[in-house]
Amino acid sequence: MKYILVTGGVISGIGKGIIASSIGTILKSCGLRVTAIKIDPYINIDAGTFSPYEHGEVFVLNDGGEVDLDLGNYERFLDINLYKDNNITTGKIYQHVINKERRGDYLGKTVQVVPHITDAVQEWVMNQAKVPVDGNKEEPQICVIELGGTIGDIEGMPFVEAFRQFQFKAKRENFCNIHVSLVPQLSATGEQKTKPTQNSVRALRGLGLSPDLIVCRSSTPIEMAVKEKISMFCHVNPEQVICIHDVSSTYRVPVLLEEQSIVKYFKERLHLPIGDSASNLLFKWRNMADRYERLQKICSIALVGKYTKLRDCYASVFKALEHSALAINHKLNLMYIDSIDLEKITETEDPVKFHEAWQKLCKADGILVPGGFGIRGTLGKLQAISWARTKKIPFLGVCLGMQLAVIEFARNCLNLKDADSTEFRPNAPVPLVIDMPEHNPGNLGGTMRLGIRRTVFKTENSILRKLYGDVPFIEERHRHRFEVNPNLIKQFEQNDLSFVGQDVDGDRMEIIELANHPYFVGVQFHPEFSSRPMKPSPPYLGLLLAATGNLNAYLQQGCKLSSSDRYSDASDDSFSEPRIAELEIS
């Protein structure tokens, strides 16, 4: 097993996750089996109870793990399925050690950070690195580990010490440290400054880790003189200084790394049985990055949500839309609309914001209402859903978005004016959306219906069924505590709103579709968590196809989005023969 530790310096949020994912992608393109681990040095057990404004979206794994959004990057880049134990937190480690102490496993010893916490970290990493993640039963060969935060943070000290010890346990030829640092550029002079990187590397060395590669993040390409200066003062060869500047798309990052001979370096440094360059997989990434930059036609989608001030709150939704837009050769223009801005109260308090929000909604080719919690902003979401339904605008509702679509239809089409969710009105006269009793204990953490679940199609005449490849059932990831009341669905199906997908027992409503509408679909699950750059999510793909006027032609062509499909490379903008560009990982 080979271990690649990715650390960061100067500031957080400079792209360690993307760089770690890109490194894994390059090594996978060389024919190696790759897994990934993210370490978050916070005391929370997992990310399940975080506000989206704290760390961005909560990403959900197949096994129901609620984890950091970086694991979503790993899954998308590497096309793998990780587990909740691939996300290590300080809380998990301390809980694990304290439980062992309570059982008496330490035989009365004084339990300390060193060696007990550090040993637990090393043991966890070694055990989890062996777990297959690509659908095969073969053990991974490479484990990419990202240490969250920045070097010098007090929260991360036990983990840094753990890896200081681990580098000797694993042996030099099996352990490599990549340090990601910021090279700021002064706006007044345009000069790129190396001092922050020098200090960061010095701090890392002072803690016992020496970087094998220094990845320099900058707004513009780094000059050779700057690269040589970093090489000299940080005591590494020039080829060990990798420069990653801001690019138009993250698809370009693996290509930038590969162009700087990173494969050759890993081959020599870790004694890998590979060639000096990446294979056909990376060629597809290069082609995808090139195509992304050549796109001309634009598709505008309005995302109506309550967490729009921080884009990371909807990271997977954005990626799923981007994957689908790229697949049909369109550039995505995603317009974030705070749902409160669509409400009447905003018209009174801030008319300018109200009219700007409605102008965005009216200009959109398609409307998306994603998942969320709480009553704030729900009236605005209902307004957006009503607009999409009545004006025949393609619409996709996810989780809460689907529940609100059902409520909107009940109020405006079935005259059930008191229809509501018990999440918002516990004593609603018409409880259209109800809580699931088995998922309603006292604690909030990990108490929802989580992880991958099977959804069975009730009818063959379903748009989503066709988009999924005309299969009888699908498996997607869930994260919800409320569901549509199954006792009230008959009225809907008599009025063109069909519940075309249900769980295996037929008790839970999973998919809705509205007849006589270009695309009005709601799903209880979160398909964005399963979307991949080369295998876009069918519900999101359907939204983009409908928004560009190509859905009917695509369905008539009989295209299927199964793992065995081979799609032709369509770099032009024509869609005369509906098809998906060649995006699939082989």
UniProtKB/Swiss-Prot annotation:
Q: Which residues carry this modification: Phosphoserine?
A: 568, 571, 574
What top-tier enzyme class does this entry carry?
ligase
The gene for this chain is: CTPS2
- Which reaction is recorded as catalysed by this protein? UTP + L-glutamine + ATP + H2O = CTP + L-glutamate + ADP + phosphate + 2 H(+)
Q: Keyword DNA repair, does the record have it?
A: no
- PROSITE patterns reported for this sequence: GATASE_TYPE_1 (PS51273)
- Which sites are catalytic? 399, 526, 528
Q: Which InterPro entries match?
A: Class_I_gatase-like, CTP_synthase, CTP_synthase_N, GATASE, GATase1_CTP_Synthase, P-loop_NTPase
Q: Where is the Glutamine amidotransferase type-1 domain?
A: 300-554
**Which family would the database say this protein is a member of?**
Belongs to the CTP synthase family.
Annotated GO biological process? 'de novo' CTP biosynthetic process; CTP biosynthetic process; pyrimidine nucleobase biosynthetic process; pyrimidine nucleotide metabolic process
Does the record bear Transferase in its keywords?
Answer: no
Name of the molecule in the record: CTP synthase 2
| CDD domains, sorted | CTPS_N, GATase1_CTP_Synthase
Pathway(s) it belongs to: Pyrimidine metabolism; CTP biosynthesis via de novo pathway; CTP from UDP: step 2/2
What superkingdom does the record give? Eukaryota
Q: What GO cellular component entries does it have?
A: cytoophidium; cytoplasm; cytosol; mitochondrion
Keywords assigned: ATP-binding, Glutamine amidotransferase, Ligase, Nucleotide-binding, Phosphoprotein, Pyrimidine biosynthesis
- Region (Disordered) residue ranges read 563-586
Query: From which organism does this entry originate?
Result: Homo sapiens (Human)
Primary role = Catalyzes the ATP-dependent amination of UTP to CTP with either L-glutamine or ammonia as the source of nitrogen. Constitutes the rate-limiting enzyme in the synthesis of cytosine nucleotides.
Q: In Gene Ontology terms, what is one molecular function of this protein? A: identical protein binding
Q: List the EC numbers from the record.
A: 6.3.4.2
